[in-house]
Amino acid sequence: MPRSLKKGPFIDLHLLKKVETAVEVKDKKPIKTWSRRSTIFPEMVGLTIAVHNGRQHVPVYVTEDMVGHKLGEFAATRTYRGHAADKKAKR
């Protein structure tokens, strides 16, 4: 369910400050964050943000198409390894 338009997009303040300083200094190092719930803003385009997936930080290079989406959408938390093979099919 999308967020109400009257509330506006959400971004954690600590992440916003890190993004602003990275843009000011023109720093290309990945910004580590645990904030998967933050919305991607236009200021983030061109930056690499390392989003935590519960186990490690996944580097996400932000493009213009990603604006408006959440950071967590681009760092998968579950790995699907397929269903167990059927014993009858192996014979």
Curated annotation (Swiss-Prot):
GO biological process: one example: translation
Assigned keywords, A-Z: Ribonucleoprotein, Ribosomal protein, RNA-binding, rRNA-binding
Gene3D superfamilies (alphabetical): 30s Ribosomal Protein S19, Chain A (3.30.860.10)
MF terms (GO), sorted A to Z: rRNA binding; structural constituent of ribosome
Residues annotated as signal peptide: none
Entry GO terms, CC: cytoplasm; small ribosomal subunit
SUPFAM superfamilies: Ribosomal protein S19 (SSF54570)
Keyword presence, Cell cycle: no
InterPro entries referenced in this protein's UniProt entry, alphabetically: Ribosomal_uS19 (IPR002222), Ribosomal_uS19_bac-type (IPR005732), Ribosomal_uS19_CS (IPR020934), Ribosomal_uS19_SF (IPR023575)
Highest taxon of source: Bacteria
Family (UniProt): Belongs to the universal ribosomal protein uS19 family.
Protein name listed in UniProt: Small ribosomal subunit protein uS19
Organism of origin: Hahella chejuensis (strain KCTC 2396)
